[in-house]
Amino acid sequence: MSNVLVLKSSISGNNSQTNQLADYVIEKLQGNNIVVRDLSQQPLPYFDTAAAIAVRGEPKTTEEKQLLALSDKLIEELKNAQTLIIGAPMYNLNVPTQLKSYFDFIARPRVTFQYTANGSEGLLKGKKAIVLCAFGGLYDEENLVTQYMKSILGFIGITDVQFVYAQGIGFGPEAIEKAQASAKNKINEIVAAL
């Protein structure tokens, strides 16, 4: 049995293509220890000055201490997972604010990454990530969502990353059905190899 952390970030609830794909992955991974964190239904606080002070490990106020405790909890969930499933829809060419806030809270110096003479080094090595992307249009792999997800995951040490795309969902019901079928086929391939 493996520990799996599922991050949902869509604001569209059950209508979300990435949430539907995440639920499909959860169904395929039954029998594993699965933790689901819905960043839209349980939003994190806005990452502000107090949060920045907290994640640097220098909390002084009650608010900063609470934010550090939240960061610790999120990082513990992530550290416990061998596999990370991330729903990352494209909103205005980038990831949802909720997902960006999550990474702001877990990207902590000397905890999930460190600086070395050769640059930054991620400390969460040996994990797999599957990123579920949904795009209204058609985009190549140079899109900002893919590039951001590769960069931030690599920054914290997760380099075994696979992407599943449901593209063209803005073209209507037939396009959604086709995109979902294609994405589910890709998920089946990935899950079979886990």
UniProtKB/Swiss-Prot annotation:
UniProt entry tagged with the keyword NAD: yes
Record's cofactor remark: Binds 1 FMN per subunit.
UniProt keyword Oxidoreductase, yes or no: yes
Molecular function GO terms recorded: electron transfer activity; FMN binding; oxidoreductase activity, acting on NAD(P)H as acceptor; oxidoreductase activity, acting on NAD(P)H, quinone or similar compound as acceptor
Annotated InterPro entries: Flavodoxin_fold (IPR003680), Flavoprotein-like_sf (IPR029039), FMN-dep_NADH:Q_OxRdtase_AzoR1 (IPR050104), NADH:quinone_OxRdtase_FMN_depd (IPR023048)
SUPFAM superfamilies: Flavoproteins
Keywords assigned: Flavoprotein, FMN, NAD, Oxidoreductase
Broad EC category: oxidoreductase
Xref: Pfam families: Flavodoxin_2
Reaction equation(s) it catalyzes: 2 a quinone + NADH + H(+) = 2 a 1,4-benzosemiquinone + NAD(+); N,N-dimethyl-1,4-phenylenediamine + anthranilate + 2 NAD(+) = 2-(4-dimethylaminophenyl)diazenylbenzoate + 2 NADH + 2 H(+)
Chain segments annotated as transmembrane: none
UniProt-annotated binding residues for FMN: S10, M90, Y91, N92, L93
Obligatory cofactor(s): FMN
EC annotation from Swiss-Prot or TrEMBL: 1.6.5.-, 1.7.1.17
Task of the protein: Quinone reductase that provides resistance to thiol-specific stress caused by electrophilic quinones.
Known partners and oligomeric status: Homodimer.
Family recorded in the similarity comment: Belongs to the azoreductase type 1 family.
Entry protein name: FMN-dependent NADH:quinone oxidoreductase
Lineage of origin: Bacteria, Pseudomonadati, Pseudomonadota, Gammaproteobacteria, Pasteurellales
Gene (name only): azoR
